[in-house]
Amino acid sequence: MVRGALRGGRPMRGGIRPPFKKTFVPRHPFDLTLAEVFFPKVPSAGAVDDSALTAALLKRNQDLSPTPSEQTAIGNLVTKVQAVLDNLVVAPGDLTTCQLEEVRQVGSFKKGTILTGNNVADVVVILKTLPTKEAVDALAKKVEADLKASMKTEVLTKGDQHTVQIHERGFDIANVHAKVRILIATLPQNLRKLEPEIHLDHKLMQSHLAAIRHTRWFEENAHHSSIKVLIRILKDLTRRFDAFSPLSAWMLDLIAHLAIMNNPSRQALPINLAFRRVFQLLSAGLFLPGSAGITDPTEPGHIRVHTAMTLEQQDVCCYTSQTLLRVLAHGGYKHILGLEGNTSVVREMSVWNGVCISPLTAVYEKPTDKKEGDLEEDIDMIENENEEEGSDDGAE
């Protein structure tokens, strides 16, 4: 008989028990917009004049929006490709290597948040059959042939000639002016049947199906014009500030929707207030370990979107937002928007209206003796420590 146990294998009272792991309860960071009733403004201070900031935001949005010629070029190409794919769903003809179930536009072009100079539209093609590499090749050739046949009566310039390029996600159809990315997916019940040597990558298939859910949610919940303006400005920030580059397009969609629509009045906030609120939330630790963050509304299981970032990336995003929030508070919005100067304000000391602002530095340091596989343990440890200490999760 095993020591410490009764006959029959039942453990004795007081025997060795597994260590108790406290349940992680995420907390919401401080949000001045939601807590404004508890922090009334000083009457003598008066309202802040943000007219200059509002005008700068609208001007920057106009600069970042695609020109009418760009919109026309990408719109025409998308219409032609969509017509060919829709026809293959109904009448596949001699295409026998795969069967199409559905064709859906996704991404920035469909949402109306595309940036100028990035004339790329995304279309997800869901296959009834398994997505083999041979099937993708055959589909690309069929689409190219049908596209040429549909345009045989048109007079095409050299720049209007289409090229097809196959890649790991599907294939691209492009001309000099625009490009349409065909992203291949399959029915959810087929995902478990995929084999790495034969079919396209399982994770890529999941991401393409997720893109459909993201676009559907956006059309239903984030169609307000102010949200699209803010998303376009945030996308530009991710291009110019390295600290924000880990933020995915889906994260930007969600934080823009949160900043504008999640308030006591349930009415869209003005663009200037929403722009400030984004930096306030990130500075307060919205995307730090221990924070409730933003739950992905399209996924089961209460997944916080910022957990896709590493701990270093979460820290850099937070302290960079804190620096930029201080710059914004003292009138440095033109440097943040890229209308003047450069991005050195997050790396070098700067002076704004007599106020000296020094950039903040990293708080989190990754242990050098741990492997990449220990990252989840680090996150759990930090979140549990924060829970016990009752900190505000702000990387000051």
Curated annotation (Swiss-Prot):
> Could you tell me which residue ranges the DZF domain spans?
22-379
> Where along the chain is composition biased (Acidic residues)?
374-396
Which cellular components does GO assign to this protein?
catalytic step 2 spliceosome; nucleolus; nucleus; precatalytic spliceosome
Q: According to the lineage, what is the superkingdom?
A: Eukaryota
Keywords, ordered alphabetically: Activator, DNA-binding, Nucleus, Transcription, Transcription regulation
| Molecular function via GO | DNA binding; double-stranded RNA binding
GO-annotated biological processes: mRNA splicing, via spliceosome; positive regulation of DNA-templated transcription
Pfam families per UniProt? DZF_C, DZF_N
Record protein name field: Interleukin enhancer-binding factor 2 homolog
Q: Which organism is it from?
A: Drosophila melanogaster (Fruit fly)
